[in-house]
Amino acid sequence: MLISQSWLTRILQTSNPQWSVSAEEFDAGFVRVGFETEGYEAIPETTGPLVIGRVEKIEELTEFKKPIRYCDVNVGQANGTGELQHIICGARNFAEGDNVVIALPGTVLPGPFEISARKTYGKISEGMICSAMEVGLASQQNPGIMTISDADLASANLKVGDDARELLGLQDTIFDVNITPDRGYALSARGLARELASSFDLQFRDPAQDPAAAAMRNDLFAGLPGTDGEVQALKVDEDTKCSKFGMRKVTGIDPQAESPLWLQRELMLCGQRPVNPATDVTNYVMFLLGQPMHAFDADKVTGELHVRLAKKGEKLTTLDDVERTLDPEDVVISDESGIQSLAGVMGGSTSEISEATTNVLFEAAHWDQITVARTCRRHKLSSEASRRFERGTDAAIIEDALDFAVALLVNIAGGQVEEGRTLVGAVPEMPMITIHTSLPGKTAGKIYPDGTTISRLREVGCEVRETGSRDDNGAREIEVTPPTWRPDLTMPADLVEEVLRLEGLEDIPSIVPTAPAGRGYTPRQRMRRNVGQALAWAGYAEILPTPFIANDVFDVWDLPADDPRRLTVKVQNPLESDYACIGTTLLPSMIESLRRNVTRGQRDAALYGVEQVSVPKSAKPFSPMPSVKQRPGAEELQELLDSLPAQPLHVAVVATGNRQLQGTWGEPEAFTAADAIESARVVARAAGVEITVRNAEYLPWHPGRCAEILVGDKVVGHAGELHPQVCERAELPPRTVAMEMNLDALPLEETFPRPVLSAFPAVLQDIAVVVDEATPAQDVEDALRAGAGELLEEIRLFDVYHSESLGEGKRSLTFSLRFRAPDRTLTEEEASKSREAALQFATEKVGAQLRA
């Protein structure tokens, strides 16, 4: 929030007349009570003759592409001669007789921009008529020149030719205070002044009830008519969650009136552009008290105002001239002619204040925080009002805000306040929180003086009552009721934070506890680490799969309707509506990542990811969220636990293109289904388990090039080549391969005894066998392994050969066999006997014949 140091200082000086600090101390004061400032900046200095002038004559120059005015301006004796200054200006919002700010030759405006007499548009221009931005009061260009009323000059005891700096308040500093979402009360001068009073140990008078405390006229509220009776018929529907709604009315204002300079200045320094007195008053009250308001042109409101939920398809053109289609969850204010406002966010254009408005209806309300936040998100629309309603406002000051608004408007634009006030609803009841006074000290590890907790909570604005009870250490029990402007205080921890914040977070001792002895990784963590390292060493690049998958991905895969992978967890408020499901498999995310790599030119890619998936236990919807006001009961907790999905840890691999690139070492080698199966073996070795593979049909894999991975008799994953249609629909090259395994299904303890490491040499032999084309290579390998006996240490398939000479429907499989004895040097004869035994057993089991 942007706010000037002078505004906050004036509020605090009403109770502390002599108080004043530097900008650096001001900044430190914010930090001391837990508020960060994005920065602070003094209004840029203007040097030289910056004076008040009066426009005496305007000559319109029409021979140029845009309208130009040649003005005669009276600057008194400021120019040393008393003669009129002749100044060229392109702005159109001032007239003869208006008081303006003049930068005479020799003035250096912020920029720096030096003013000198020079010829332009065929005339000599002897200075500049300034806008608010040009003198440093506004950060954005305001439409036109800044004019000063005679009343502003009289109140400051100034005349034409006098220096304008003091009137403009150019000796000031602007602070940009970072307000966290839980502290909506601080989005106001009232809230920040209260915090600074605590920081500097000052007295504080609440400006909500006392105009003098807001550094305004003591008699501002004097003469306000009574509030008996209604000024506007009103109906508030209960389902809108509007707890309080109030209105007051002003009639007969001067439609040509302008806001005084002091009001325009405060708004500009808060980053708000002055518009007209009625709108400026609502913005000023919002920045002063933190209560957003809206001003209706009362003559454009017909019949009863109705606070209700929008109907589907209703439309509203908001003040930013955008037509919006409303949602049934949006809260609106309507009358007999239609919708007039999007509640808590922005008013409608049909009843906005115009240059002809003479009767104004002010509205102030207390809207539901969540409803306003969802409306803003839904319409991608944010405003100063919605920022405050989203964070929570003070329902207790609605009447005060209305009184401020009507009194200020009458003071500025004339007219009279209509007797009566429409008020529906009441201030929501604040929760009572019970704590012991020792809790802040226990939390901080610091002993605070007796009474600190009570005094600090009262300083925040809480009502504190001692119950008379004490804990075992003698600490008093107190019942605390937070103030209405602090809806964020709901539990003991919130009260502890307030005490520690005001006592000084920097005073809490920084004592590092003794770290317990490390126990290392758990077996599951060790498995995950080993698997990741093994795949990385095998040449795969790690990615972090997103848990969200496209709603239609399983339709793209043509999965059967009864496939259990279709039963997914649905997210109620997804980041993207097309990705509202939490995956039961990692492959959709892996395939999408591979697609992005391929489309960006990475044709040869091998990726792996290790992440949890979510597998619902049933199609039953989740239990509703429990209340946060109390701990859930045992039955409610069990129901919640039963409804949570299982979240097994999966590992997945996808690869496409060439496994080995072309080079001096040889021709390129493409990824095949065998590489996907080998990645499963890499995972198994890293996890310390033994797997087997066999043919399978399992989408999204190719039905003839898919293997299921087993540990014992349990299927733990699949690997192979993706289905051609899946590749085409996913925009992947043909013959892309993939593997996915359930790591949680792998046993933590090895299912086979660790082999004894032998120091004796191994004997390597190869064997080539001819088998039927339909015989799985795994079956042949298993038969050879079983027949070779205990001397066989490793068997590996390294060649598959097809030829007409082998016979129709035949193929050759060549295996490398490694034999080793644990207690002696193995001879070639012994190894050959084991090889012959392996061949004989394979012949009996799978019909394998030794290849000639």
Curated annotation (Swiss-Prot):
The gene is pheT. Residues 44-159 form the tRNA-binding domain. Residues 428-510 form the B5 domain. SUPFAM superfamilies: Anticodon-binding domain of PheRS, Class II aaRS and biotin synthetases, Nucleic acid-binding proteins, PheT/TilS domain, Putative DNA-binding domain. The lineage of its organism: Bacteria, Bacillati, Actinomycetota, Actinomycetes, Mycobacteriales. Belongs to the phenylalanyl-tRNA synthetase beta subunit family. Type 1 subfamily. It comes from the Bacteria. Keywords: Aminoacyl-tRNA synthetase, ATP-binding, Cytoplasm, Ligase, Magnesium, Metal-binding, Nucleotide-binding, Protein biosynthesis, RNA-binding, tRNA-binding. The keyword Cytoplasm applies. This is Phenylalanine--tRNA ligase beta subunit.
